Design a protein with these regions (language model features):
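Noncatalytic alpha-helical scaffold of FAD-dependent oxidoreductases
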Residues: 1-268
Length: 268
């Protein structure tokens, strides 16, 4: 796989894949973004990060993509063909060979620019972020099954990305071994029916993740069951026991903490 072959390259500063959400090649074709290191420090005249360009147009396109296959295909066409031609540069356009990919940027630029246009301020709907961490050897069978789940449900998938994840040695790790992460951005109505559909979809994706030895990211939505929670994070009871040991009065608490404690079945 391309990701596996490029990961050891220390000259790459940022690398990820953006999957198609168009029906014709849904979660099959991918745009790969690669940023090579040219210096450890930015040049002295590097501009400060400002407001990203084209946010309004990008948001219009992503909103249109909720309305069916024609607009989803249009979104993929603009991402694959048009956006690279209009990316802003911090060096002269002639020096950048008239290609957005050839621009000199800091690592913060691509990470910053992707956020504002994803913000949904429309009433009666919202966009929900999902992330699933899959052992690398299991990624191909996982994505095949995830693709079928997502195709056979009614909520619009607005964005899908794949990123490399290294082993994380923390108490509640989402990556006990090297993994690939599937990041999804899914639109839903905010009424009871929309919440029910999102809950069912989330649980289906969690179940296929667990089937392939993966884990889901805890904080996004509390749509998982206690069984799914403990299957994904078997360390949770020990974590909660340590929490009680060092904080017996539960001075440090939150709605999220109380929710996962209740789901885990741990006695208060």
């Amino acid at each position: 796989m391309l990701f596996r072959s490029l990961e050891p390259n220390k000259d790459i500063g940022l690398f990820y894949g953006h999957l198609s959400t168009a029906p014709g090649n849904f979660l099959e074709d991918m745009i790969v973004y690669r940023y090579d290191k040219v210096a450890e420090e930015p040049p002295a005249d590097q501009p400060e990060i400002g407001e990203p360009e084209g946010v309004g147009l990008k948001r219009v396109i992503i909103n249109l993509a909720k309305w069916g296959s024609v607009f989803q295909e249009l979104k993929w066409f603009t991402e694959k063909t048009l956006e690279p031609k209009f990316e802003s540069c911090t060096v002269a356009r002639t020096s950048a060979m008239a290609q957005g990919e050839a621009c000199l940027v800091t690592r913060n630029n691509p990470m910053h620019d992707s956020v504002p246009y994803l913000f949904n301020d429309l009433s009666d709907e919202t966009d929900i972020l999902h992330e699933y961490f899959i052992p690398r050897a299991a990624y191909n069978p996982f994505i095949a099954q995830a693709r079928e789940i997502l195709r056979n449900q009614s909520l619009p998938v607005l964005n899908a990305s794949v990123r490399i994840v290294h082993k994380e040695d923390v108490a509640l790790t989402y990556a006990p071994e090297p993994a690939y992460s599937l990041v999804l951005y899914i639109n839903q109505p905010t009424d009871a029916d929309g919440n029910a559909r999102m809950r069912a979809l989330t649980r289906a994706l969690i179940d296929v993740t667990l089937k392939h030895g993966g884990r889901f990211f805890l904080p996004y939505q509390l749509h998982y069951t206690g069984k799914e929670l403990l299957a994904s994070y078997p360390e949770l009871p020990a974590f909660l026991a340590s929490k009680r040991q060092y904080d017996p009065t539960e001075l440090f608490s939150s709605t999220f903490y109380r929710a996962i404690k209740a789901l885990s079945g741990v006695v208060p």
